[in-house]
UniProtKB/Swiss-Prot annotation:
Name recorded for this polypeptide: Urease accessory protein UreF
Subunit organization: UreD, UreF and UreG form a complex that acts as a GTP-hydrolysis-dependent molecular chaperone, activating the urease apoprotein by helping to assemble the nickel containing metallocenter of UreC. The UreE protein probably delivers the nickel.
Coiled coil: none
Compartments where found: Cytoplasm
GO molecular function: nickel cation binding
Tree of life domain: Bacteria
One Pfam family from the record: UreF
Main subcellular location: cytoplasm
Presence of keyword Cytoplasm: yes
InterPro entries, per the entry: UreF, UreF_sf
Keyword DNA-binding: no
Length: 224
């Protein structure tokens, strides 16, 4: 696939229109706002910056890279291992369910395109959205770095749009946040791609607590 088509496919994978329900989850932010842990734009920036440099850089991106390389090598066993590793590192039932729901939705999209149907791959593809993204990126010859940045921006955009509704703040502030927090993604990715297998894993206790409390939050805008 030429570079222009690879770019278009990347934009498709990173699009908020991808039918995986990306904008239906707040990943604990809804409870954090209600509890007063996140107040105003500055509080939101601090909350998301921790996730960029912990969850994204120390877990999601390194695992995405390993899933991508497993697809390139046609190593279904390694792909399954890292898919399960990612799911095991989601610290709450809510976060694990979100991961599986996104993965199943993307797997159904692959079914519609008659892709990823081999039994050795199909079950693992349902475990996470990252698995489906890695599989499609390898299939479409999207470079790993571009894939990771596209995924990171899509994740950040989803978080900022949740912040618009919950914190709240306006669209001007939202775009400024996307610009400023987005500036931190390339350096965080450099760190992520340099980690060894024994260095992978993130842990944000307040995020885990917020996600757990969100499961039983009385009134919610976002899915649990």
């Amino acid at each position: 696939m030429n570079s222009d088509l690879a770019l278009l496919r990347l934009l498709q994978l990173a699009s908020p229109g991808l039918p995986v329900g990306g904008f239906t989850y707040s990943q604990g932010l809804e409870w954090a706002v209600e509890a007063g842990w996140v107040r105003g734009v500055d509080g939101f920036v601090a909350w998301q910056r921790e996730q960029v440099h912990d969850t994204l850089a120390c877990l999601d991106w390194p695992v995405l890279a390993r899933l991508y390389h497993a697809c390139q090598a046609e190593d279904a066993a390694a792909f399954g291992h890292w898919s399960r590793f990612l799911l095991a590192n989601r610290e709450t039932a809510e976060l694990r369910l979100e991961e599986q729901q996104r993965g199943a939705a993307l797997a159904r999209l692959l079914d519609g395109w008659q892709l990823g149907q081999a039994p050795a791959w199909r079950a693992s593809l349902e475990l996470s959205q990252l698995g489906g993204m890695a599989w499609l990126a390898a299939h479409w010859a999207i470079p790993l770095r571009q894939l990771a940045l596209g995924h990171g921006f899509a994740w950040l955009e989803g978080a900022v749009m949740a912040g618009v509704k919950l914190v709240p703040f306006g669209q001007q502030a939202a775009q400024t946040l996307l610009r400023d927090l987005g500036n931190e993604l390339p350096a965080a990715l450099d760190q992520a791609l340099g980690l060894g297998d024994d260095q992978l894993g993130g842990g944000l206790p307040l995020l885990a607590i917020a996600s757990s409390r969100h499961e039983t939050q009385y009134t919610r805008l976002f899915r649990s």
